[in-house]
Structures are given as structure tokens and as C-alpha cells.
Amino acid sequence: MIIDQLISTTSKYDTPTMCNAMDIILGTRSAIGFTKSSMVTAQNSTQPVVGFAKTAKIRASSPPLVSQKEINNIRIEYYEYIVKNEENPVVVIEDTDFPNCIGAFWGELNVAVHKGLKIKGTVTNGLLRDLGMLDSGYQVIAGSIGPSHAFVHLTELDTPVNILGLEIKPGDFIHADQHGAMTVPKKHLDALPHALDLVVKKEVPILEAARQRDFNIEKLKKAFQASWDIK
């Protein structure tokens, strides 16, 4: 599938609908492939963050074990990495202090920098701060909110990460919104448009029946059967 078409199509749906579409593709429900805890968002927007993962790890609970010069070099290397050779990059950062995160990597400065670099958004299990000062149009979906950056520093780049129970590898297709995040294996990307369309169509008979004034259990049974018959 053409990447621009994939992004355009999946951006029209929320993350729960994407999870339902994966159930259709797999032919069964699943307990993997999505985050397992509540998240917070930088922007009061339902527009999802959609793209391909650029991954890193951070820590804030203790000072870095290398010199400030090396820390600065790693940070520049990180910015170079996230803009290199990937269409629609989404930054995915694991805070290895989790579940006791104390320092925010995400605030006014990094939001401005990432927005300026044309990154599509961020998913992290770590902290977010500077609420009310963040540039509009850049979404950070984070694990929690806190006041300080503490000793926050990058420790690894381009590595598998775990965000609230969701395993993400560099280059994975990711879809996230205020509900949380999920990934779609690349082998299933071509099947997504049909599966998403089917999710919506199968809900229509039930929703239409339920919203009628004379709705009752018999109408519900018929609506469910109509939904099950849609293939």
C-alpha cells in the first residue's frame, strides 16, 4: 500500500476502531498489540498520531554516567536519527524509570523542536510538563504529568521499547490517541482499509436499532443478526 494513502485512511479512525480492525484481520480477539494503562495527552484533540516508530530510551532518576559533552552529542545524534530515512516518523520513548518516572523529557522545548522537525507526534510511558505552554498541533501521548526534568537524559536509540505493555520495534506502524496506542504488523497493513470499513458497517445495524424509540429485545436480536451477516 502507498504510505500516504495508508496514513490518510487510518487517520480518519480512532485507536479503538483500529484495535477492532485488527480483531477482524486476525479472525479473533487479542490481548496483545496495545497499551494496557491509561494515558494523558498534551493537546485536547481526538486527531490520532499515526506513523512509523522512531524509538529511544531515557532515564531521569540518577545523573548520567558520562560527561556532559557526551550527553550533548547523544542528544544531537537523537535528533539526527528521528529525521533520517522515515516517512511519517512518530517518536516512541520508553522511560526506564517506569513506573516511578520523576523527570519529564517532554515539555515546551522538546515539543517545539519536534514539531519544527516535522515529527508526527510522540508516544511515551514517561512524564509530560509545561501544560498550557506547549505549541498547538503537536500531540504527546504520555504516561503521566510531572513538574521537573530531574536528571532526564537519553540512554539508547533505535531499540525495542515497551510502552505500558505494548512492545514496539523501530519502524513499527503505530496509531495512538487519547485512548492509548496500538501497532499493526507490516504484513497486515494492506488488509487495514477493508477491515476498518467492515468494523463501521457491522456496527450500523445495532446503533440504528438502538436509537429508535420503539427499540426492544426482538429488534436487538434482529440487529445483531444483521451485523453478523455482514462479511
Where are these regions (language model features)?
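Channel- or pocket-lining gating/hinge segments that regulate access to a cavity or pore
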Residues: 180-182
